[in-house]
Amino acid sequence: MTGKVTISEVSPRDGIQSITGDFVPTEVKIALIQALYDAGLRRMEIGSFVSPKAIPQMADTAAVLAFTKTLPGLESTVLVPNRRGFDAAIAGGAERLGFFMSATAGHNKANLNRTREESFAELASLVRDTPKGTLIRFNLSCVFHCPFDGVVEDAEALDWVERIVALNPDMEIALADTTGNASPDQVRRVFEKAHAAWGHRFAFHGHDTYGMGVANVAAAYEAGCRVIDSAAGGIGGCPVAPGASPS
């Protein structure tokens, strides 16, 4: 295990989606991505192919994706929640797809209006249908705590991880502290268990809601995690986890 860490910058997606009020112009999003690229970042979540009624700020993701394809060496990930988003992402030439669901029933229902089994069944079909050469990252929200269901037991979260792992031997899996409630001990323990069972294929997506973001990143690193999400300026958060701010 090397000490090298891959930073995945999520502010163009996680940050922008949280902005209410006026629509952030496409050129502003492009300028943000260009600035991050100029700063040396080479991996970013740049948008989501979701319903513009649900998340209006992501309505121009196709245009943003087209711009990112002009930046040499940039790994651009777009999030897709369902078949419609998947089809739009593939049509737009996406080379990295981010699938997502929640480890808890309450958050999955609030965020996706589906049961976990319904989400998993559709995402499993999307994993199977992903074109060869297209990379996948599977994001599991609320691994540690849920705004609706409270503290998540390790076993519940890891049961879902086990099912996700079985879908594809190569895809990266992100374990998310969606609300920022996790403790370093909890993060370290879950990552140690995941790595012991399925190898070092996991990323950490944390939030700094209660000032524990950096400590939790350190705990994930100590447990062997080498892919960490960041958000420039600490902007962003989940629409159904009020107050959560990225680390």
Regions found by a protein language model. Name each.
Residues 104-162, 166-178:
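Conserved anion-binding
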Residues 1-45, 57-63, 67-71:
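Conserved N-terminal beta1-alpha1 strand-loop-helix module at the mouth
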Residues 176-247:
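Catalytic alpha/beta core domains of metabolic enzymes, predominantly
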Residues 6-12, 16, 42-46, 75-80, ...:
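Hydrophobic faces of well-ordered beta-strands that scaffold small-molecule active sites
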Residues 1-21, 98-111, 134-148, 190-199:
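N-terminal small/glycine-rich loop or linker at the start of catalytic domains
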Residues 8-30, 74-83, 108-115, 143-156, ...:
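Active-site mouth loops of central-metabolism enzymes
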Residues 42-67, 101-114, 142-149, 174-184, ...:
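Glycine-rich, proline-tolerant flexible connector loops at the mouths of alpha/beta enzymes
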Residues 54-78, 118-136, 158-164, 186-204, ...:
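Alpha-helix-loop-beta-strand connector modules within alpha/beta enzyme cores
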